[in-house]
Amino acid sequence: MSQFFFNQRTHLVSDVIDGAIIASPWNNLARLESDPAIRIVVRRDLNKNNVAVISGGGSGHEPAHVGFIGKGMLTAAVCGDVFASPSVDAVLTAIQAVTGEAGCLLIVKNYTGDRLNFGLAAEKARRLGYNVEMLIVGDDISLPDNKHPRGIAGTILVHKIAGYFAERGYNLATVLREAQYAASNTFSLGVALSSCHLPQETDAAPRHHPGHAELGMGIHGEPGASVIDTQNSAQVVNLMVDKLLAALPETGRLAVMINNLGGVSVAEMAIITRELASSPLHSRIDWLIGPASLVTALDMKGFSLTAIVLEESIEKALLTEVETSNWPTPVPPREITCVVSSHASARVEFQPSANALVAGIVELVTATLSDLETHLNALDAKVGDGDTGSTFAAAAREIASLLHRQQLPLNNLATLFALIGERLTVVMGGSSGVLMSIFFTAAGQKLEQGANVVEALNTGLAQMKFYGGADEGDRTMIDALQPALTSLLAQPKNLQAAFDAAQAGAERTCLSSKANAGRASYLSSESLLGNMDPGAQRLAMVFKALAESELG
């Protein structure tokens, strides 16, 4: 089954171009009117007095190359089909459209199709009288013995250098020389957990190695140099850094580009950046470019690192602002700092105290919740994410630990409730921890005001309902908690009646085919009908334990 949002395969590249133009922040992109099979994007603010810088290649590497058209970078980009070089006619058309007397530089990634098609177009353009030079970028170091290293993400840095000198009116020889220098001092290496999905691909599964990563996988899914037996971010980054250090000159300041190959989450890219800043390369890194998606391979689950050796003109070119959609501003690696809060601690202050009755209730409730962990997880797996038992068991173990270490104010219920509310936000994940914290915090405040325990618990319930948005009948723990607390208002010492009310409320959730709160609200009626809400069941079991005890 295809893993790609698109309309028609034949319109895919054109649709991609349209989207890029529509969202251009500088409003400086335009299609070149031509044969429908020729897809060229150009600068609207074209200045033919300057050297034109043209790049392109197969689509599927977005934002390359359209995302780098604009003042200070590319003049035009020629877009082929997905992972297919543009035609000779398309490249020649682009040259003719944007090249003036200053000439043009073609920047080409080192793949056979691109070399041949751009190369023949350059020869034809020269025959027509155009001053054309072509630079082939081969920055991939993953296969060091390869006579023709592939052009990958480092190509974007060459765009930046060439565009800088072209924008400032330098002649073609100078633009070419500076771009060649940049290319010869640019080193890239990629890694991926899996290859990419092609549009409309239904049979072939992306290549992947469970528990492993493929070093040097190509930007079209070509096999890499080796499969490594780890997916640990620090180990992967350090291995890549070792290979970059082996290829780089022994000294010299660097800018390093962190490129998302298309399918890596923002969170993972942040972790990768952190690992790079902790790697043996960190002392030489003056500038970071990214993390960002710059040269992708559709949805490939991978990333690449590119290092460029800095000298004065290269550094200035990299740091100069441009008017493109996707060039990220380089930044120096930042120090991780902490700001000390000037506010007084909001933590609950207390003195531990003893109360045998309260201690017995805390022991009973926490033990009940711990014992219910597996049962509630199984119930939650049918209507949620299968972790409610573990969530409440973790909270129960925390409170029980404080009890056993005699670190609870058992003789001051207002402070005890406030402390429980504070701890629950720390040890309970998700919204459940916050809701129960609201419940106990509000109840504790009501006790401070002189209310009795049942009144305080009902106040906690009211605040839980207000902030959480759920009510009785919404298939949540409130379906058991509210009937039980209502029963206690009428009969404060009748725990059996409270349990009966809670159990009846929990059982009513089996008859409900619609949840109005929590994760269950996203499930179908078929998934809910006949299954008791685990939160309601949990509360009913707590009241059952209390009713059957001799603590009441």
UniProtKB/Swiss-Prot annotation:
Residues that coordinate or bind ATP: D385, G386, D387, T388, S431, S432, G468, T476, M477, D533, P534, G535
Pathway: Polyol metabolism; glycerol fermentation; glycerone phosphate from glycerol (oxidative route): step 2/2
Tagged with keyword Metal-binding: yes
Cofactor: Mg(2+); Ca(2+)
Domain DhaL: 356-548
Residues holding substrate: G58, S59, G60, H61, K109, D114
Enzyme class: transferase
Gene3D superfamilies in UniProt: 1.25.40.340, Dihydroxyacetone kinase, domain 1, Dihydroxyacetone kinase, domain 2
Active site, per annotation: H220
GO cellular component annotations of the record: cytosol
One GO process term, biological-process aspect: anaerobic glycerol catabolic process
Keywords: ATP-binding, Calcium, Glycerol metabolism, Kinase, Lipid-binding, Magnesium, Metal-binding, Nucleotide-binding, Transferase
Start and end residues of each DhaK domain: 8-327
Assembly and oligomerization: Homodimer.
Function of the molecule: Catalyzes the phosphorylation of dihydroxyacetone.
Name of the protein in question: Dihydroxyacetone kinase
Organism: Citrobacter freundii
Gene: dhaK
